[in-house]
Amino acid sequence: THFSGCKGKIRSVNGLYEGMMDDAINVHGTYLKIVERIDDCTVRARYMHGQAWGFDWGYIGDRVQFVRSRTMELVGNPFVTEIKEVVECLDEHKDSASPLYGVSHVAKEFIIRFGDVLPPEVSGYEGYVVENLT
């Protein structure tokens, strides 16, 4: 059972978890890879895992942090002032087991503007991701 990008409290009471193969409950956020620094306050960021597409990643006012992939170093702590989905057309998913079954359009990328000037090293060239802390 995975919970991703949730806010508030998650309670599991008297649950029976069998045949899960790994963690019975996995609570986590979803990173977006920085693929382009558009200007000092704006980036283009992308889901890199096919099972993550389609999640609402963030909202205006959310607080984020940047993470250098190679070292897990944390950089910056700005808040989102604008977020725009970059929607792609897909071949409609035919597999009824897929969470995207029947979906023909999905947001894989976002243009995200922040309330602060970004650290200079945050770009599409330095291997950074953005994590929503809210």
What is each residue range found by the language model?
Residues T1-T134:
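Extracellular/periplasmic carbohydrate-active domains that bind, remodel
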